[in-house]
Amino acid sequence: VASKSIPIQVIYLVIGVLIGLAAGYGVFSITTPSPRPGEVPTGEGRVYTIGFTLPLSGELSSIGKIWEKVVKLAIEDLNNEVKAYGLNVTFNYEILDDETKEEKALQNVQTFAQKGIKVVIGPAASAQVKVVKAFADENKIVIISPSSTAPTLALKGDFIFRTVGSDAGQAKALATLAYQEGARKVIVFHRNDEYGKAFADFFINYFKGLGGTAVSQPYQTGLADYAAEVSALAGRVQSEGFDAVVLVAFDTDGANILSHAAESAILSKVRWFISEGPHGASELLTQSIGEFAAKVRLYGTRPLFIANPLYIELNSRFKERFGLELSVFCENLYDAVKLAGWAIIRAGSYDGEAIAKALVEVAKTYYGPSGWTAFDEAGDKAMQDYGVWAIVKTAEGKYEFKDVGVYERGSIVFIEVAYE
């Protein structure tokens, strides 16, 4: 996925085109007879339910709990937007916890299918998306993941859509960041799952192409503690002379790994780089991890278009209402809700195939907090930008996540100083 910038001046024009088209199709939708399960006609119009399978517990729970709030805000905004155009349509939502587990995500999608729900947003992890794919395709249920990024799932002609670019792009950005920062011999410490393995493979290929050397060291997922795994990593770093560690993790495992790394004299002497997975998790904002981040000059990448005023506006509203900053993929989740709603309206019938086709068309002209949402031929976000983030100390002595750079035209450009 190439990193491309979108001119800010087209934002409002694009949104106007989207809403104009969607509103026109919405009038047709309201007059469509024969409601199906998941679509409820009332005296005041039609009510549609969008299903959500989110990681409210398990390895992505820190981020999942933030996402739950994003869903609430996005549904409210969608309903207000629809009503502003005079459409007698209301969207409800149902959230089920998938515990960041593959089989639980499948159970949730099956539960939604039994209720006649044709659009499900989530699951979060690529391993989960891989498991639900066959059922979704067979039953023509539209799956929109805001965060699955494994390149191995970039497949044509299925019912899986992703409002984020695949890690083929992010791995290139992270490899560029590490090399530009002086890393030459890297060990990639990664989750031994669909996401981690694919990310590591792409990173290693890109990093070698830049002139560096890199090897992978997978770790088992789902452990209560990673002390032994971090100890083994330290031993290998010392014996083989690596000058940097690249961590590809989720939030709970990532925080646990960094907490143990902070106690290692060996791992505190090499540079650290990190994927988007742990971004936004409060567990990373402890004093020990914050001090470690400064010591090793920890930088990460994440899908983000920093110069997007719609993202800034959403983050401001979210912080005012919930007292929190947006975490990784919040903007992708928000846009997934908007796309799903307008695709249902535009489809003209509550049918998975019709909604999938409408989704592609709506995304072509929708520009939201995550940027331009057009899909490529595999159903992934076609134009994905990447930002660089760090963990920095505030004036009050606390720690926070901060976006400090961008991946632009094949190189990293820092816009703020993260570490002295």
Segments predicted by a language model, with ranges:
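Loop/turn elements at helix/coil->beta-strand transitions in domains of secreted/extracellular proteins
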Residues: 46-49, 87-92, 115-120, 138-143, ...
